[in-house]
């Protein structure tokens, strides 16, 4: 259980401090909690989409493409918005094309530029799996008020911005 694991983390941080380790307990707890909850939510997401037959990364790229105007995009856009390398986007889109979930064609304006489009089968898969997956995942947030959810989102945005500033992280594409 996550609550048991979080308690063990708190106990471990206190024990490390008692042994003389100079670590800010609150920062250590925030860091470890984010990691633990993030992994657990990722596992829940994997389980929710498993019946679709897609891996989480494939499903996320399909959803990202579906969420674009007219379900059309380019590999570079998918790369920038998904934190995947160009090579991984290529592999993922190859898989989605092979399964008939998206189509790939060359741009009429620039034959070197690929156009990716969600196919009817991809739209059907999304319409079939997304509502139930998000209902399942949504139960995690049901105990939070609308105000608490908005605050959590704002705080996560702040953490993401601080991370970007700290690392200078730019998309690989």
Regions found by a protein language model. Give the residues of each.
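Short amphipathic alpha-helical segments with heptad-repeat character
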Residues: 31, 35, 39, 83, ...
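C-terminal regulatory/oligomerization modules of transcriptional regulators
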Residues: 1-22, 147-173
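N-terminal leader segment of winged-helix/HTH proteins
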Residues: 1-52
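Alpha-helical hairpin
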Residues: 23-26, 54-56, 118, 144
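Charged, amphipathic alpha-helical coiled-coil/dimerization segments
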Residues: 94-154
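N-terminal helix-turn-helix DNA-binding core of bacterial DNA-binding proteins
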Residues: 25, 35, 39-85, 167, ...
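Alpha-helical linker/hinge and terminal dimerization helices associated
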Residues: 41, 82, 125, 129-144, ...
